Amino acid sequence: MEEHERIRISGVINDVTFANPENGFTVLELESGDELITAVGVMPELKAGELLELSGYWDFHASFGRQFRVELCEHKMPASAGDILRYLAAGGVKGIGSKLAVKIVDKFGENTLDIIENDPERLAQIRGISPEKAKQISADFKRQFAVREIMISLEKYGMTTAECVKAFNAFGVRAADIIKRNPYALCGEGVGFSFERAELIADQLPDPPDNGYRLQAGVLHVMSHNLSNGHTCIPREKMFAPCTELLSTNEDTVDITIDELIGSGRLVSEFIDNREFLFLPHIYKAEKSSAERMKQILRFPPAGRKAADREIDRIEKKNGIKYGDLQRKAIVTAIERGLLILTGGPGTGKTTTLNGILQLFEDDGLKVALAAPTGRAAKRMSEVTGRPAKTIHRLLEVEWDKHDRPQFSRNARNPLDAQAVILDELSMVDITLFSSFLEALPIGCRLVMVGDSDQLPPVGAGNVLHDMIASGVIPVVELTEVFRQAMESLIVENAHRIVKGEPPKLGVRDKDFFFMRTDSPFIAAKTVSDLCATRLPRAYGYSPLDDIQVICPSRMGECGTNNINRVMQASLNPPDASKPETTVGATVFRTGDKVMQTRNNYDIEWTGPDGDGTGIFNGDIGILRNVDLRSRMAEIMFDERKAVIPFEALQELELAYAVTVHKSQGNEFPAVIMPIIGVPPRLAYRNLLYTGVTRAKKILVLVGSQSQIYSMAANDKKARRYSALKHFLLVNEE
């Protein structure tokens, strides 16, 4: 990568052409000598007329030409009367508009800012400024000055301007004092710096911080890392090795630090089968409250009723179907007990059973709500039931606090307006979302949960579906009979063979499951691209963007998503003068690209056919419809929702011609292409292969190594995931 020469430039702001108040990204014109310079980067709030000294480097933009990329921004207040007027007229101080700015500067000239700060009573000499307004003007000016002083102080600690903005938003005017005393506070909730970054900032401080802060932050960092790997808790003894390595200390010190964190309530301890486990408090609360809510439903079940055989017979006749014994059992359980987990693999009739339950609920006059974890899963649920379905977030009427944490309007104090709720794709739901969902259920509400326990666990923390089934306390019906029509599909047959640990049939032709063998990762990647771009569209009329999805076990390697996305972008959406593009890191985003959101962003606004809303979530797939280089905004269609985002939000996207199996969960696609070659051992599990295979509705093509496909089908090991929901469901109530 080319290394740019770092330089410093200074000048007066002529105009701020773009500024994002959320993250500080700014584009401005700077008068530096006789030159008008475009400067871009993360900067604090700025106004025309301010004097800046910028550190950074020159860069060349394909559309806008030469720009100065800002890494550090220092600024001074304007000194000349002309610059002061421009600053005030641009809204530099709250309460002063352009006309009032002229009056003030005409009267006080170069002394204007000094008077605003130190002698604001004199402002009341000007018509239109009352003594009270003069005080407000001065207070706002001083607040801005304080903010800038804080930014300067923080930059001395090696923090970038973007980091300073984040710290100030979290800590306010006390930011510099807090960080000087305890830089590891930056790792806390609402700030989110990595432990390693806090270590570097700590090294820049004039005095080393208390080592206790560092030890506690390090232990919490290890706990958070476990959380990101899906664990809700961790055995205490498992903490010693990573903590001693990270902190370069001994086990006794780690042990003492853990006790301190437990004593202060920042960790929670619970013994499970005579083994001590550690939890972060909010996860402990989520698992325990979920178990308590489920036990409450079991103790005081919804008012069920006897389900007569003739009612089920009537549904069969109405829909022209015949239920199997297990399907009838599931319907009876849902009606009579009001609580059910319905599970089973593809082709076992989960959807048919679900529709029968739904029709009987409605026949009883119940108001039924349908929900799923993702937008695509909710859309599919709506299609197969013929009724509206929402994401769990929308069902709970989510709002977001200043730290981007979900706050649900529907909760125990304001429960859902429903008498029955059906929740699909339960295997994808993590424990924190499940806890919020259960909290919002009204007393007496019937609950049917649907999922496939053989799929991968959720990306987030917890193992909700598995733990509830394993507890044995929740009514479960597992559909095992594969219906004849479904068995005509080799996708369905092979999915069930994989679940049983049997090798899938790979040599059958003229079906819906195909295998193209190669032992070369390079050839496999090229084959995948050709299948998506040419062969499947030609044979079946599929759209490469809308109907075909490449699903990879891993990101890395020749057949990982990173490389295949580059290959397929070059094939399906090559550079063209009519397609504006921009580069973020190593990724080119071009008009027409298929993209995916990689983290929850609760602030993105969107419009759709059913109304407007906010929030685009991790795993949402869309098409980049327009890249506007002038406004630095991008338009993306996520299914039927149109979102317009600033360029800086593109860093939360990645190309989605190929996605990982984990990211594909909850989605189904008409055609799936899956390269299986060189899969890392940590991912070469049966449930990963099974989850990928069951994403395909009509056509599946596996490309790669026959021996690896067979070995994955035989490998029933699963990545160990520590969770406690089963324990809390089984533990005696106090």
What function would you assign to each model-found segment?
Residues 311-338:
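Conserved pre-motif I regulatory segment
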Residues 453-614:
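Conserved helicase motor core of P-loop NTPases
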Residues 233, 328-331, 336-509:
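ASCE P-loop NTPase helicase motor core
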Residues 500, 609, 618-734:
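C-terminal accessory regions
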Residues 1-310, 733:
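Accessory, non-ATPase domains that flank or precede helicase/AAA+ motor cores in DNA-metabolism machines
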Residues 49-51, 592, 619:
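Loop/turn positions that initiate beta-strands
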